[in-house]
A protein has these predicted regions:
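Acidic/histidine-rich catalytic neighborhood of metal-dependent amide-processing enzymes
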Residues: 1-37
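Metal-dependent amide/peptide-bond hydrolase catalytic core
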Residues: 25-32, 41-45, 49-198
C-alpha cells in the first residue's frame, strides 16, 4: 500500500535506474503521467449527549458536516495542463438515533497531476481546518498516504519509452493505445525525474 515497495526500490537504486517500467493488470492504455494524491482520516470528538435532554450540545457529525461543506466550497487551483480533484469518500459516527454523536470520522483525499496544485490543496485543507475550529470540538487529522505526481523528465527519453510501450501494446493487444494519466508505481520514479511508464 501507498507505493511502499516502489519507494523502497527507488530509495536504494534510483541513481542507477535509467528508465522504469511497471506492468499493471490492464492492457488498455499506457500510463505515463502521474497523478499525485494525499489521503486523510479526519476525526471529530465532542461531549455529545441525549438528543432531547442535551439538545444544542455539539455533535461530532455536525462538526464533520461543516468541514465537508467547507471543503466542497473551496476553489480549485488552476495550472496549465493541471487537473485537481477532491473527495470526501466516507463518513461514519454516532451510536444511536437519540444520541448526539460524540465521535465521527471521515476519509478525505485530493488529487492532482501538478505538484504546485497538490501543495496548494494541502494549504487549503489547513486553512479550512483553522477557519472551522470550534472550542467545544476536538478535530484530529491523520495522514493516511501521500503519492507524488510526476515532474519533468528528459523529454526525449520519456517519449522513447512511451513509444516503445505503445508499440508493444499495439502488437500484442491491437489498436492505438493512448497515453493516460494515473496513480501507479510510476509516480515515484517520475517524481524523481526518471522516465517511466506503466
Amino acid at each position: 500500500g501507498n507505493l511502499k515497495g516502489c519507494k523502497a526500490i527507488m530509495r536504494d537504486f534510483a541513481p542507477r535506474v535509467k528508465a522504469f517500467l511497471s506492468l499493471d493488470d490492464q492492457s488498455t492504455h499506457v500510463c505515463a503521467r502521474a497523478v499525485g494524491s494525499a489521503r486523510y482520516r479526519i476525526t471529530a470528538d465532542t461531549r455529545g449527549g441525549h438528543s432531547f435532554a442535551d439538545f444544542g450540545a455539539r455533535s461530532a457529525i455536525e462538526v464533520l458536516s461543516r468541514l465537508t461543506c467547507a471543503l466542497y466550497r473551496q476553489a480549485l487551483p488552476r495550472a496549465a495542463g493541471g487537473v485537481t480533484t477532491y473527495n470526501v469518500g466516507m463518513i461514519s459516527g454516532g451510536t444511536s438515533i437519540n444520541a448526539i454523536a460524540q465521535h465521527a470520522e471521515m476519509l478525505y483525499e485530493y488529487r492532482s497531476n501538478d505538484a504546485k496544485s497538490l501543495a496548494a490543496m494541502k494549504e487549503k485543507l489547513n486553512v479550512i481546518l483553522r477557519e472551522n475550529a470550534l472550542p467545544d470540538a476536538k478535530v484530529t487529522v491523520e495522514l493516511l498516504g501521500e503519492r507524488p505526481c510526476g515532474t519533468a523528465t528528459d523529454p526525449a527519453a520519456q517519449k522513447a519509452l512511451e513509444t516503445a510501450c505503445c508499440a508493444a501494446l499495439k502488437h500484442y493487444v491491437g489498436g492505438k493505445k493512448p497515453i493516460s494519466v494515473g496513480s501507479t508505481d510510476c509516480n515515484i520514479p517520475l517524481s524523481l525525474g526518471i522516465p517511466s511508464a506503466s
